[in-house]
A protein has these predicted regions:
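Bacterial N-terminal signal peptides that target proteins for export
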Residues: 1-12
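Cleavable N-terminal signal peptides
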Residues: 14-15, 25
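Short, low-complexity N-terminal intrinsically disordered segments enriched in polar/charged residues
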Residues: 22-55, 59, 160
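Surface-exposed, charged secondary-structure patches
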Residues: 28, 62, 76-123
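N-terminal, post-signal-peptide region of Sec/Tat-exported proteins
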Residues: 46-87
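Solvent-exposed loop/turn segments at secondary-structure junctions
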Residues: 60-63, 69, 117-119, 150-154
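Short beta-strand edge/turn micro-motifs at domain boundaries
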Residues: 128-158
Length: 161
C-alpha cells in the first residue's frame, strides 16, 4: 500500500512539474511567434512583398497614429497601406524595431517597441517613435489586427542592425 501511495505521489508530482515546465515553454514559443509575425510584416514593407505583409494581418486590420493636436489621428486600413506598398518601385521603407516588449493573455497579445524608419536609398532616419502591435491568436497563428504608432522627426537614435 505504501509503495502504491509513493508511486501515485511521484506520478502526480511529475505531472505537475510537466505542466509547470510546459507553460513557460509555450509562452516563450508564443512570444517568438508574435515577434516573428511583426518582423515578417516589416520585412514585407522593406521588400515590397505584399503577400508576406498580408500573411501577418487579419482582414480589417487598422493603423492608428497617436499624437498631434487631437492626440489621435484617423485610423487607416492596413489593406490600403499594403496596396500602396505594392505599387512602389524598388525597395520600400526600412522600418526597424528594437527590444520588443511582448505581453500575452490567452489569445490576445501586444508588442511594444521603439522604431526607426529610413527611406529607400537614404541613411538618415526619417522618423522614429513607438509602435504598438495588437495581435490575436487564431487557428492560423498570431495575426496583427491593429497598429498604434507615435512618430517624430527629432531626437531619433539609430537602431543597431
Amino acid at each position: 500500500m505504501n509503495s502504491l501511495i509513493r508511486r501515485s505521489t511521484v506520478l502526480v508530482a511529475v505531472a505537475i512539474a510537466s505542466l509547470l515546465a510546459a507553460t513557460p515553454a509555450r509562452a516563450q514559443s508564443d512570444e517568438h511567434a508574435i515577434v516573428a509575425a511583426v518582423t515578417k510584416f516589416l520585412d514585407g514593407i522593406r521588400t515590397r512583398d505584399t503577400s508576406l505583409m498580408r500573411s501577418t494581418v487579419v482582414s480589417g486590420a487598422t493603423l492608428v497614429p497617436v499624437g498631434g493636436p487631437t492626440g489621435l489621428g484617423a485610423p487607416s486600413a492596413i489593406d490600403g497601406i499594403i496596396e500602396r506598398t505594392g505599387k512602389g518601385i524598388g525597395p520600400g521603407n526600412d522600418e526597424r524595431i528594437e527590444t520588443p516588449k511582448v505581453q500575452i493573455d490567452e489569445q490576445l497579445a501586444s508588442l511594444w517597441a521603439y522604431f526607426t524608419l529610413t527611406r529607400p536609398g537614404e541613411t538618415r532616419i526619417d522618423r522614429c517613435g513607438v509602435n504598438v502591435f495588437l495581435l490575436r491568436k487564431g487557428p492560423d497563428g498570431w495575426k496583427i489586427f491593429q497598429i498604434a504608432a507615435t512618430s517624430r522627426t527629432e531626437g531619433c537614435r539609430a537602431i543597431v542592425k
